[in-house]
Amino acid sequence: MAARHHTLSWSIASLHGDEQAVGAPLTTTELTALARTRLFGATGTVLMAIGALGAGARPVVQDPTFGVRLLNLPSRIQTVSLTMTTTGAVMMALAWLMLGRFTLGRRRMSRGKLDRTLLLWMLPLLIAPPMYSKDVYSYLAQSEIGRDGLDPYRVGPASGLGLGHVFTLSVPSLWRETPAPYGPLFLWIGRGISSLTGENIVAAVLCHRLVVLIGVTLIVWATPRLAQRCGVAEVSALWLGAANPLLIMHLVAGIHNEALMLGLMLTGVEFALRGLDMANTPRPSPETWRLGPATIRASRRPELGASPRAGASRAVKPRPEWGPLAMLLAGSILITLSSQVKLPSLLAMGFVTTVLAYRWGGNLRALLLAAAVMASLTLAIMAILGWASGLGFGWINTLGTANVVRSWMSPPTLLALGTGHVGILLGLGDHTTAVLSLTRAIGVLIITVMVCWLLLAVLRGRLHPIGGLGVALAVTVLLFPVVQPWYLLWAIIPLAAWATRPGFRVAAILATLIVGIFGPTANGDRFALFQIVDATAASAIIVILLIALTYTRLPWRPLAAEQVVTAAESASKTPATRRPTAAPDAYADST
């Protein structure tokens, strides 16, 4: 047993521990502090939205604020606008941090209060200009290329639309000649938006933000259900995952298609695991793979006094249970669709496949059979989608498009850049490109090995599939050739539904705050260094003053517990925690 505790699978599984599913209700003092915290965060997002009028990624043409006296003012005082945006983002992040006091403690806020808080914080950003990124303009250009009958996987905005096109003008120069790196589902949706809005940039941007809102809604729906499946408190998972500042800043304000990818993936995983739980799928055989679990149990265990022949005769006329199969099929379809937005979410299909193989016996034969079935289903869905959209499988050839970016957040890329600079200093020449290809290849190899090992751990019942998926995505993000701030959400959101140890949550919080606050500016490529420095210094002073002014009114410190405990609180001190319903014996190391 002591040796077992030193295994890697045990170390990963130890990140999870069942926690109290429902906390005691908040006291009057805590409810007041919660309301003030909610207002503090909402004020921050309002400041972000106002500052975005000058510091956001506004379009080059068709800017609706141009010439409007009040709305055009922020664009004339860009340093002030950047200060407002930065200050608002810090206020929202600090409010989120204080909100954690009401989601991780013994007394917790209700799910409804957390949902309303998230909605309140997002509302100002839904009508604000894009922030932190201009990717949405690439979405518009690539979708317009498809609407014009060209292949967005072969031509970029400049060659497909022309340099003077209204969409191309707003696309960053780095991406004007590159084909689309996104899946056919996303480009198909974008083509529909282009058909609906034409060349109206504002309407098209708002439609893409609506798509993001749909994705966020799916995330909010799926995350607490996955958390409940893993024995984790719903509000804890939602706070760390769906209410994460990175989601608000980059997916909502920045309009990134990761929202749709994650929403479809998480919803698909929940549906698939629910179907497998409902069926308790037995090992497949010609006699049993079309029977419902009740019929199979009856055929294997005839009633007392009944002859084996009688039990067999009852199994001849089974009543199939199509519900579990439909849920598994729906989940698999949603996961595959998510991969047709961005490919990394296809990892979820691997973990659903291993759970299915575990249900079928957990041996090599079961794994090969489950892999063949799920791979065939996945390829069929991709083929149908490629045929329906007219885009085929061209996306395979553009998967490496983003590798032209040299991201300092990617350890393989950072290592190569550092090595290249050392070589230059030593007079050995600039070998950065060669080293970059080597370090990135090693990173991809490590990702492949780790994902295969995690799949094997789930197959053997040593790791919960949600935990395996989250860790696999974390490894993928860590060693990916290109890492953007919002990529951290690939791992944080699924892990928030499974990992409960303080070490993980502290690491996730620190990563969120460091990347969210000290990462990008609202539109860094438009600002001079002195503007960024001035705005950062001014924001720091303003935030310090705000903390000083609200120190006694906001929960900057832990609130003193009230002496009187309500009857409702006493009754809810030891609620029954729902254990994972999917073969709990399979994940004994995760509890």
UniProtKB/Swiss-Prot annotation:
Region: Disordered, residue numbers: 569-591
Main location per the UniProt record: membrane
Transmembrane regions: 40-60, 80-100, 117-137, 201-221, 235-255, 259-279, 321-341, 367-387, 408-428, 441-461, 473-493, 502-522, 527-547
Membrane-topology descriptor: Multi-pass membrane protein
GO function terms (MF aspect): glycosyltransferase activity
Subcellular location: Membrane
Family annotation (InterPro entries): MptA/B-like (IPR049829)
EC number: 2.4.1.-
Alphabetically ordered keywords of this record: Glycosyltransferase, Membrane, Transferase, Transmembrane, Transmembrane helix
Enzyme class, first EC level, given as a word: transferase
Biased composition range(s): Low complexity: 574-584
GO CC, alphabetical: membrane
Role description: Catalyzes the addition of alpha-(1->6)-mannose residue.
Recorded family membership: Belongs to the MptA/B family.
This protein's name: Alpha-(1->6)-mannopyranosyltransferase Rv1459c
Organism of origin: Mycobacterium tuberculosis (strain ATCC 25618 / H37Rv)
Upper lineage: Bacteria, Bacillati, Actinomycetota, Actinomycetes, Mycobacteriales
